[in-house]
């Protein structure tokens, strides 16, 4: 929120931009009543950059391989399973709470400061689950990726089911990132910046770096992003 507010108050000259993500722009306004910025009034959208897929990941110490098995495990062990997030009100906190509601289960929430500590505790087995980007040690047998938090399978991981395949009542929200400028930025500058970002997203080396993270390149106009 601090960085987002700094950009909101910056000169609207095209030289200070926000790489916005779903939390500060789309989620936090519903969680905090005293935000110093307004995501609609304080910014103009430039270009959506990427969709960032996340997955339901559990410790390998839990004897489950599917979302259904995980739900059964939770119902058999109520209040004994803890999940981690990158902080109160974060995207993975909210998604795990959505999962709990949809599945009718209980888990203890343990907030951390960043994804690194969550991953470390998950690998060590000191927490049992989280929603994180499916990369890093996830293929090394230390944890199990049960499902992608989406309504369709990821092209990067076609063998991993979408969570709605096993839990249809779960309706996940998207996890994206994109560029914004302070409100008042001249329209010509907005267009020029958007065109430059879209051109960059078409460069093979840029796309490769994004896709190496198992993200999906988006791109698009300010109007498309604003919708």
Give the role of each language-model region.
Residues 17-20, 48, 112, 131-133, ...:
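Short beta-strand and adjacent tight-turn residues that come in two discontinuous sequence segments
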Residues 23-34, 98-102, 129-160, 207:
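A ligand-binding cleft/hinge motif common to bilobed small-molecule-binding domains
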Residues 9-16, 30-117, 163-165, 172-209, ...:
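Hinge/capping helix and adjacent helix->loop/strand transition within the periplasmic-binding protein
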Residues 1, 25, 64, 90-93, ...:
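Loop/helix-junction capping segments adjacent to catalytic residues or to phosphate/diphosphate-binding pockets
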Residues 2-12, 97-98, 102, 116-127, ...:
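Short helices/loops that flank or line small-molecule/ion binding pockets
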Residues 221-227:
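Extracellular/periplasmic bilobal clamshell ligand-binding domains
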Residues 14-18, 55, 128-129, 145:
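Short, Asp-centered acidic motifs that coordinate Mg2+ and/or phosphate
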């Amino acid at each position: 929120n601090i960085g987002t507010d700094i950009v909101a108050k910056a000169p609207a000259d095209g030289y200070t931009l926000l790489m916005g993500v779903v939390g500060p722009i789309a989620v936090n306004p519903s969680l905090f009543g005293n935000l110093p910025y307004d995501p609609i009034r304080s910014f103009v959208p430039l270009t959506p950059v990427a969709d960032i897929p996340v997955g339901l990941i559990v410790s390998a110490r839990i004897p489950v391989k599917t979302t259904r098995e995980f739900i059964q495990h939770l119902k058999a062990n109520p209040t004994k399973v803890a999940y981690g997030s990158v902080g109160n009100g974060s995207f993975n906190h909210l998604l795990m709470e959505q999962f709990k509601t949809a599945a009718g289960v209980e888990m203890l929430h343990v907030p951390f400061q960043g994804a690194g500590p969550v991953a470390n505790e998950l690998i060590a087995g000191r927490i049992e689950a989280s929603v994180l980007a499916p990369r890093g040690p996830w293929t090394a047998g230390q944890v199990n990726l049960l499902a992608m938090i989406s309504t369709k399978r990821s092209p990067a991981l076609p063998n991993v089911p979408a969570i709605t395949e096993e839990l249809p009542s779960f309706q996940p929200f998207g996890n994206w990132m994109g560029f914004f400028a302070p409100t008042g930025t001249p329209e010509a500058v907005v267009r020029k910046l958007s065109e430059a970002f879209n051109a960059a997203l078409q460069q093979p080396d840029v796309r490769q770096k994004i896709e190496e993270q198992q993200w999906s390149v988006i791109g698009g106009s300010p109007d498309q992003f604003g919708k």
